[in-house]
Amino acid sequence: MSWDQVWIDVNLATMDPSISAPYGAITNAAIAVKDGKIAWLGPRSELPAFDVLSIPVYRGKGGWITPGLIDAHTHLIFAGNRANEFELRLQGASYEEIARSGGGIISTVKACREADEAELFELGRQRLNALAKEGVTTVEIKSGYGLDTETELKILRVARELGKHHHVDVKTTFLGAHAIPPEYKDNSDGYVDLIINKMLPAVIAENLADAVDVFCENIAFNLEQTERVLSAAKAAGLEIKLHAEQLTNMGGSALAARLGAKSVDHIEYLDEAGVKALSESGTCAVLLPGAFYFLRETQKPPIDLLRQYGVPMVLASDFNPGSSPICSTLLMLNMGCTLFRLTPEEALKGLTLNAAKALGIEDNVGSLVVGKQADFCLWDIATPAQLAYSYGVNPCKDVVKNGKLVHQHT
């Protein structure tokens, strides 16, 4: 056989649902790569003969290979920090109180409007490097810290540039409807008009976004405004998604499902009717335990209902300066299990196959299947559950992206 590389002495957590074993596991396995794709995988005993002198062979020393991790919800590009608000919350102020007093998202907006593209790029690069060291091979990056046309475009341009200069694939999301800027404080409908009539066309003209998101909440955008933005995005051919049911149950998830959204994110206050709507539409539920933890929330997402109705559950970092300043997907695996009571298998699926579904890229990445992109990680672990069980020592040994070895952890 003519391959570009072969990995032996490994176990595979394929996350392939057609394999009945937990994690889609194949033990004592091998995997071969050709032209950036997975060319063969299976038990080592069934590996076809190949020329070991001409093909690089990597020995995994009994470790586990998983699909590359996918962080499907981040706000990775921002300037400044909100440590002062952290102190205020510890003294009793709520997220909503801080936001209504001019803090929260608006304070980050001010910093991002003042920062230039070079500064934002360098900040984003450092954060993307941190995720990459934990085995992340695809990341979604939202705008939403500009709230004016110029700065929203600036953030999205930086995100696109990061994708061009980093081995991690970057999917971009336009989140102009993240908050109402101070200049539109008494005219939120006017700001929605600006998003639809000026911002969105400018984003599309530069091909800066793969999807559009809205923060549907009573401190941000109501259902009618949300539907206007998402409908305009859908009419323009962009994927849609929604921040919904984080602080209250406004029915945003049902709206998103009706419009065919790829995902609804946060969903702590999602009810059974909303879960059923997601199930019927095939919309993913993105769980964000970092924000739940950092904001010291108590209302948990309806995990049992999501299981009952077969809604794909996704885990993501929600990395941002205000509610989840946690740049770690491995910690999300642990939090998903300890805080939300996911099983380790559900948690890993939420950062691989289901995360790919939330971004509409599951045909190419998210599981180890012949013909899919060769994005995978070798972990120094005895069982896949160990990824969620233990935190603090990074077990990521090697990362392959598009068939190329891009990271070796010595």
Swiss-Prot record:
Keywords: Cytoplasm, Histidine metabolism, Hydrolase, Iron, Metal-binding, Zinc. One of its GO terms (biological process) is L-histidine catabolic process to glutamate and formate. This is Imidazolonepropionase. Fe(3+) binds at residues 73, 75, 243, 318. One of its GO terms (cellular component) is cytoplasm. The keyword Cytoplasm applies. Its EC number is 3.5.2.7. It comes from Shewanella baltica (strain OS223). 4-imidazolone-5-propanoate binds at residues 82, 145, 178, 246, 323. Binds 1 zinc or iron ion per subunit. N-formimidoyl-L-glutamate binds at residues 145, 320, 322. Catalyzes the hydrolytic cleavage of the carbon-nitrogen bond in imidazolone-5-propanoate to yield N-formimidoyl-L-glutamate. It is the third step in the universal histidine degradation pathway. Belongs to the metallo-dependent hydrolases superfamily. HutI family. Its cofactor is Zn(2+); Fe(3+). It holds the Pfam family Amidohydro_1.
